[in-house]
């Protein structure tokens, strides 16, 4: 793929999933969106809620669908051979909104935690080094 001049979708959001490498990390593509040759995308059909479908994508063990010998890789055939049962559209919408809100809440709390927390790993390394140096000097004198 040398260049992309037009969006793949101007008005419908989709679910993106890596074709190579990060095959187990689906995410929502907001319209308009463009893609690259190492990404599959799925625009939900009528009567399929995007957030509900996204929840399904997140719960599929994509690594079991891996068709590679090196870098994790998916094919359209592997994706198209997945069948799931789904409730009525109205129920999908309720469930999709519910899980979307939970995902947003988790993300918000993770961001807050990162802002509040001092870099613990850096202080552990420093204290570990100090204690280790003291321990070594004690053991050398015995």
Tell what function each PLM region has:
Residues 1-142:
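Feature detects amphipathic, helix-rich regulatory segments
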